[in-house]
Amino acid sequence: MKKMNIQDMKAEAKEFGKIMSSENHKMLIGVNDGKKIGTYIEHRFQEFVSRKYEIEVGNSAFGIDLPSVETDIKSTSIVKPQSSCPFRNARQKIYGLGYNLLIFVYDKTDTTATCTLDFKYCTFVEATRTADFTTTKRLREMIDDGANKEDIIGYLTDKNLPGDEIVYSDLSDEILCHTPEQGYLTVTNANQWRLSYGRVIKLDNAVSGVWNYGWN
């Protein structure tokens, strides 16, 4: 079996969404728990690609879904395109999650006998683009304007980035040495990161490192 690469995964995602939109997902009738629906879709995609490719499959509870392509699968409703992911460290908000994301956005419709998952968008976000949009935008502006370490620490403090003085000091040194890439997610502080995808799913392939596809 061929090993799956990123391009293969994108091609399969397009076909997968088309197939899923045509099915009656009876086991999801009346289910409104986004996490359960997401897990169902993620497992279905893992099964779908594993029939054609040699892949390493991860566990959605521990680690990422497709370690062999360094990608985690996210599925979310068009009503509120967001999900959560494990918090590793504050650095993720500035330099990205550390892995790619493959995001499926669906519209769920139920009747007494049917459940339709109408797949609307698929977006692949490279790891370098998974940081927070506003935070990286402002930090990049500050660096362009000649900000120093104290300025950066002040900004991180104002934004209530998780961490203490040592974390802020270390991050500020890194930011001044390595300007963060512009991120395109909205990453909200919580016990887990809350990721919002409203912006990234509608970039229409205008940004390098972000691939967008729509079925409708």
Predicted regions and their residues:
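Acidic/His-rich structured neighborhood in mature extracellular/periplasmic domains
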Residues: T71
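Nucleic-acid endonuclease domains
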Residues: M1-P67, S75-N216
